[in-house]
Amino acid sequence: ESLMECHYKGGKDLLSLYYRENPSTSLFKGKHLIASGSLNSFTGNKKTIIGDLSAIIMQHLPWWCEWRRSPRGIGKLTSKDWNEKLNYICHTSSRDDIHLIAGVPSWILMIIKRIIDQNNVNNIHEVWPNFELFLHGGTSINSYLPLFQELFGKPINYYQNYNATEGY
């Protein structure tokens, strides 16, 4: 419980800092695409869940996060089958008004490329014109930054966040 509380507080702090630095933001008028890892049931005890920390946190998001998240629901989003997850995210989120994206750069890169291809557009702002913030962590974004700048189509804000267990 304290782990979850700590991560949710970190998320609230990050969004509060963003809002303070960008008071005219429309971040909270749209949806937030959050990419997570996968979950598994422990065969020794079905009540025990094992998996990536991002998936465990997303499974227990508070209501004030859940109603902004795209896509909604948890099943396919935490699937071990990356292709199933990727297809679901891209198909569902393409229709939403995404303002924020959060996740590991390599995962987000695949999602963005797929959505651009599926919608036959030049950049992601043709699909999500209000996209303004990319929250990233898990690995350094430096090697991905030129790709994202090209795929996004216009400047956005980047906020880096690392758990105590992560580094680069």
Where in this protein do the model-derived segments appear?
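Active-site phosphate/ATP/adenylate-binding loop shared across adenylate-forming ligases
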Residues: 1-168
